[in-house]
Amino acid sequence: MYKTQRNYENLNKALFDGTGKYGIPVIQAADYKADNWIGFNYAKGCEEPEIHGVHFFLDDYQFIRVWSSPDVYVNMLRKFQAVCTPDFSLYTDFPRAVQIYNHYRKHWLGAYWQMHGVRVIPTICWSDEDSFEWCFDGEPTGSTVAVSSVGTQVNKEAGRLFRAGYEEMLRRLKPKEIIMYGNVPEWCEGNITPVQAFQQKFRKPLTNDV
């Protein structure tokens, strides 16, 4: 019974109308703000969720459980001012199928949380230019969004890909506000609210990271 339920990939909990080639669940636009930001790994112990937002700019293993057991965390996340959609990794050296699956999981959880009253802020992620075919599917236009710059300036190619994706995000989504986790590159445009990064993503790349 347990194994059978796991094989549903959460489709037994909710089915959402999808968009784009891969049927990505749609996230509604948000205009939420947070007085302070903490990583999901500190959310359970947070004593004042009403003045905090939760981000997922962490190593994936620290939050994979929100996908494995989504109902366990809904009530907790609903207490926070805002919750970013989970930043499942889209490394350029990941197989394309894995990248698309991670984008899908991010959106399924965002739509599921919104359905249950969580104040969701879309996290925008991309890898290389080929990912532009699907990585903005399901994202709202004119919304507050969250982006992480952590690890994107480690070399020229990573910096180039981050800029290409950022500018494509501006063109397609026209975000109202951009919550930028990490250093803000001097070329970045838009209504940016910087958030200092206390956790960094550490990973030994197979080829290159974004």
What are these model-derived regions, one by one?
Residues 1-92, 108:
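SEC14/CRAL-TRIO lipid-binding/transfer domains and related phosphoinositide-recognition modules
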Residues 41-48, 66-207:
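Eukaryote-skewed repeat-based solenoidal scaffolds used as protein-protein interaction platforms
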Residues 210:
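Internal alpha/beta domain cores that form substrate/cofactor-binding pockets in large enzymes
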